[in-house]
A protein has these predicted regions:
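Residues at secondary-structure transition points
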Residues: 2, 62-65, 98
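Compact soluble domain cores
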Residues: 24-42
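Basic/aromatic recognition patch in beta-strand/loop cores that engages polyanionic ligands
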Residues: 41-87
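Enriched for short, Lys/Arg-rich terminal
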Residues: 73-113
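Alpha-helix N-cap and coil->helix boundary residues
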Residues: 6, 24-28, 45, 82, ...
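Alpha-helix C-capping/helix-to-loop hinge sites
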Residues: 14-21, 39, 56, 90-93
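Arg/Lys-rich, positively charged N-terminal/basic patches that mediate binding to nucleic acids
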Residues: 1-29
């Protein structure tokens, strides 16, 4: 399967903030992208093409459980081709979860709904 991964503006803004805060973030993000390319079905299925994936932040020293959460939205382009939109990322230490309403707003802000 051919997978294209596209970080959206709402994701980029939060990723930039986390990158300033955690020294290992750039390497952790690269590792996350490689894992996602190898297995596009990572994480928990939230329905409607949405997934929540745990991402470790090495400099926090807490593994995936205390790292970040990435919300993705997958669009199937063709039978063997899909696009994974990186919708949002948040630090698990800053917030425990994200509501369905917030996810819908993120989709709207990025022109996906």
């Amino acid at each position: 399967m051919n997978v294209k991964i596209e970080p959206l503006p709402t994701f980029k803004r939060e990723a930039k903030r986390l990158n300033k805060h955690y020294a290992s973030f750039a390497d952790d993000y690269e590792r996350f992208i490689n894992e996602l390319e190898a297995n596009p079905h990572l994480g928990t299925d939230l329905g409607g093409g949405l997934r929540k994936i745990r991402m470790a932040i090495t400099s926090k020293g807490k593994g995936k459980s205390g790292g970040a959460r990435v919300i993705t939205f997958t669009v199937v382009v063709a039978v063997e081709e899909s696009e994974i939109n990186l919708l949002y990322i948040y630090d698990k230490a800053e917030r425990s979860s994200i509501s369905k309403k917030e996810i819908e707003e993120l989709l709207r802000l990025n022109g996906l709904k």
